Every structure is written in C-alpha cells, then in structure tokens.
Amino acid sequence: MKLTMVASPPTDRRLRTLKQLGADFAVHYDMAGLPDDFEALRAIRAHYETFGLPWKVAESGPAIDRIVLGKEGAAEQIEQYKRIVGHLGKLGVEVVAYNFMPQVTEDAMVVRTSFDARTRGGARTSGFRRSEL
C-alpha cells in the first residue's frame, strides 16, 4: 500500500511535513485554478518532487460547472478538460478524482434534499430530487 496525502495549499512547510509523515505521493487539490499550459503543470509537479513526493493524484479536476449545468461555454470547458487531462497523463499523474457537483450559488456547491437516501447494499448517502425543492 502507498500513502498519498494532500497539502492545500502545497507550501514548502506542509510538503516537508507530509514527507515526514511517510507520504509516498502527493495529491494536488484545487484544480479549478490549474493552468492548462503543459509547462505550468510541469512546474507544479517539480515543486512536489523537490520534497520527494511524486504527483500522482489530482483531486477535484478542472472546472466543469458549465458542462454539468449545460450552460453556454460547455464545449470550451470540455476541450480545456481534455487538454488538462492529457497534460496530466504525460506528467505521470495517474488519477483525476473529478467532482461533478456544480457551483449552485456563491456559497453552495452541493444541494441535497435528503441525508438518508439508500444506495447499493442499503448503504446510506445524501440525495437530491428536484421535485422535493
């Protein structure tokens, strides 16, 4: 098993601490602001590697609010998403933990109508039904 941790923001102090705690790999969180330029992404990877932490996981993924909500600009976001994922693959990032929950308001990203919905095997989760709003 390999230990992967997030440091957000990835300051030098936090990355040193992750390495001291035994992290094998870095998780980069807050990709909404990630550049889609290959060299800029390579610089992010180099920052992690300075601390002996290969960048293997990108959590949250590029912005996809227009895609999820079917708004104008969705096609451009799809192209940007594809470009960033392609760059991440070339840089050795193996996992993109995407987040398909759109920003609903300035303060809320997720809207739920239930905190006791059932899913596979009877497990409980949160849920959303438009009819319950």
Task: Pin down the residues of each PLM region.
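Glycine-enriched alpha-helix->loop->beta-strand junction motifs that scaffold or abut catalytic
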Residues: 21-25, 92-93
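Conserved beta-strand positions in the central sheet of alpha/beta enzyme cores
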Residues: 26-27, 97
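N-terminal small/glycine-rich loop or linker at the start of catalytic domains
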Residues: 1, 53-68
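Active-site-proximal loop/turn and secondary-structure-junction residues that shape catalytic pockets
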Residues: 9-11, 32, 61-62, 100-104
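Mobile, glycine- and charge-enriched loop segments
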Residues: 1-8, 44-49, 63
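Active-site acidic/histidine proton-transfer and metal-coordination neighborhood
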Residues: 67-133
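Glycine-rich, proline-tolerant flexible connector loops at the mouths of alpha/beta enzymes
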Residues: 29-43, 104
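Short, acidic/polar
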Residues: 7-20, 37-44, 76-87
